[in-house]
Amino acid sequence: MSERNDRKVYVGKVVSDKMDKTITVLVETYKTHKLYGKRVKYSKKYKTHDENNSAKLGDIVKIQETRPLSATKRFRIVEIVEESVII
């Protein structure tokens, strides 16, 4: 059971929900440059499993690493942290 707790957990924004049971999540992180000490922003997109198609474009979601679900999917949704407001 402790293995499940060691899996990576990220918080990111849904940038695509066009696929069935799959969303694309953009995760932004900061790293410090070794020589200059400046914080540099990095971003990466993850394909994420969404069983109920509950996440929508613009939502902030928490995702967790899981077993490979397809050729590109390695994450699943844990919770929707904040729902987007469509104007």
From Swiss-Prot:
CDD domains named among the record's database cross-references: Ribosomal_uS17
Record has Ribosomal protein as a keyword: yes
Domain of life: Bacteria
PROSITE patterns xref list: RIBOSOMAL_S17
GO molecular function, one term: rRNA binding
GO terms of biological process kind: translation
UniProt cross-references to InterPro entries, sorted A to Z: NA-bd_OB-fold (IPR012340), Ribosomal_uS17 (IPR000266), Ribosomal_uS17_bact/chlr (IPR019984), Ribosomal_uS17_CS (IPR019979)
GO cellular component terms, semicolon-separated: cytosolic small ribosomal subunit
HAMAP family membership: Ribosomal_uS17_B
Protein task: One of the primary rRNA binding proteins, it binds specifically to the 5'-end of 16S ribosomal RNA.
Subunit structure: Part of the 30S ribosomal subunit.
Stated name of the protein: Small ribosomal subunit protein uS17
Organism: Staphylococcus aureus (strain Mu3 / ATCC 700698)
